[in-house]
Amino acid sequence: LLTAQSMNAMKKAKRLIFRTAQHPVYAALTEAGVQSTSLDDYYDRYEDFDEMHRDMAKALWAEAEHHAVVFAVLDAGTDGAVRELRAQQPQDAVLRILPGVTLADACIAQLPGNLAPIGALRTIPAEDAVTAAADPTTPLLITEIWNRSLACDLKLRLCDVYGDELPTVLCLATVKTNRKPQNIQLWDMD
């Protein structure tokens, strides 16, 4: 799920920090001798994702005062910590986002042709989708449904907007496996 440019940046980084060691390339880079750390301990310390993202960004900017930092995430376009990095960016600091294959790209690539979106598609992480304004006229791709509790909250929210029986395509573990998308009713999501 990486471009050659992103992989090269990770291998050459003086300070490589993964949002999570669950990142698909973390183990491969570690086995190749690339030194890195992860921010997995933040998940145990925080219940509020917004607060966690703010503190991740603060820690990353503090680290960047001493070293050039490469921060590896699954999908920079939807990642809350990356949003906070942008929001907290010091005036004299440089922030470069390198392109990669997003979670949405991985999911869309697995969809049958008749379901592949043409035109507008709204991509949003699950933690934001629970409270985001709904637009039933735009196809919605929700990423990062990390646990059953979040899936349940999301299902209840979406059922309020779209109804229980909305045909839904569930793409599980698209970044780690080749599991095929499943056609389900929205009510069965969690």
Predicted features and spans:
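Class I SAM-dependent methyltransferase SAM-binding "motif I" and its flanking Rossmann-like core
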Residues: 74-142
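A contiguous loop/helix-start segment that scaffolds small-molecule binding in enzyme catalytic cores
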Residues: 65-69, 131-190
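Structural motif
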Residues: 14-15, 36, 67-71, 95-96, ...
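Class I S-adenosyl-L-methionine
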Residues: 1-98
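A polyampholytic, Gly/Pro-enriched intrinsically disordered region
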Residues: 56-64, 113-128, 186-190
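Short gly/pro/ser/thr-enriched loop/turn and capping motifs at secondary-structure boundaries
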Residues: 23-25, 44-46, 102-106, 130, ...
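Conserved beta-strand termini and adjacent loop/short-helix elements that scaffold enzyme active sites
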Residues: 39-41, 98-100, 126, 171-173
